[in-house]
């Protein structure tokens, strides 16, 4: 969880125990979810999860680097790094200090967000990081009563952005109260993830 000032991954997986270290404090051990997913997050190091993190960029970048270098990840087949939005210190540190195979950009339908996505794509290109695909979150709402689709944040523009940059749109995820409920209650692993098949295909291609 590289979103240092707004970590949410532990809560999504119901992880509340603080991480442990070896005897001399040089190695940290990640927490493990019910299904065996290893998680490292600043919230797993803090006394209270609601305490603010008021750090400058270089300190935040240093913590992100520590999460990669000073955590015993053991044998890991695939690692996901959740970055905050934008092109700041965190993604820059991730791109420079980790062996990144590619990134998935997550966006939403608003015009303003599309501009930020373009910045992220251009940053990846400048640093020779492959963009595996784009995901549009909160793309639409499907009425459970009538089945009609409503575009709460306006019609999707993700396909235009993807085509302009020769990138695949790998998923358009609807607004779903059930998803929000499971994540808020720490049960992310109980989600029906069939809507994410396109993302998995892009990663494994």
Functional labels for PLM-detected ranges:
Residues 4-46, 61:
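Phosphate-binding loop that captures ATP/GTP phosphates
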Residues 46-94:
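Phosphate-binding/switch loop-helix module in NTP-utilizing enzymes
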Residues 4-6, 45-47, 85-87, 109-113, ...:
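Conserved nucleotide-binding/hydrolysis micro-motifs of P-loop NTPases
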Residues 74-81, 87-88, 99-120:
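Conserved Switch II/interswitch segment of TRAFAC-class P-loop GTPases
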Residues 40, 83, 96, 132, ...:
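Glycine-rich phosphate-binding loops of nucleotide-dependent enzymes
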Residues 9, 40, 64, 82, ...:
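Residue-level signature of catalytic and energy-coupling elements of molecular machines
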Residues 121-205:
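C-terminal lobe/tail of nucleotide-utilizing enzymes
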Residues 41, 105-108, 134-135:
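Conserved beta-strand segments of the P-loop GTPase G domain that flank and frequently precede/overlap
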